[in-house]
Curated annotation (Swiss-Prot):
NCBIfam families: PRK05715.1-2, PRK05715.1-3, PRK05715.1-5. Belongs to the complex I subunit 4L family. It comes from the Bacteria. Keywords: Cell inner membrane, Cell membrane, Membrane, NAD, Quinone, Translocase, Transmembrane, Transmembrane helix, Transport, Ubiquinone. It comes from Bordetella avium (strain 197N). This is NADH-quinone oxidoreductase subunit K. Gene3D superfamilies: 1.10.287.3510. HAMAP family: NDH1_NuoK (MF_01456). The lineage of its organism: Bacteria, Pseudomonadati, Pseudomonadota, Betaproteobacteria, Burkholderiales.
Length: 102
């Protein structure tokens, strides 16, 4: 049995759905929200690589490197904000972040 494009797309759809379920089922914990967003982004990247490999074009694979760079910066900034929020408010619960309003 060979692995076709449909297998990669199904796996990407499953990973994307897990990320969406992670966002909808747990809206309180900021770490799980960030992890779910990153999982969704990685599912999209896997689809880019699968399509570019299947069609023999390397543009999709190069585009994935740019997306991963932006995702790494997003994760670093998100975790830095998370650390600051935990230091100031002693919580990472999203519902308790209403104290930031002016």
């Amino acid at each position: 049995m060979t692995i076709t494009l449909a297998h990669y797309l199904i796996l990407g759809a499953i990973l994307f759905a897990i990320g969406i379920f992670g966002i909808f089922l747990n809206r309180r914990n900021l770490i799980i929200l960030l992890m779910s967003i990153e999982l969704m982004l990685l599912a999209v990247n896997m689809n880019f690589v699968a399509f570019s490999s299947w069609f023999g074009d390397t543009a999709g694979q190069v585009f994935v490197f740019f997306i991963l760079t932006v995702a790494a910066a997003e994760a670093a900034i998100g975790l830095a904000i998370l650390v600051l929020l935990f230091r100031n408010l002693n919580t990472i619960n999203v519902d308790d972040l209403d104290r930031l309003k002016g």
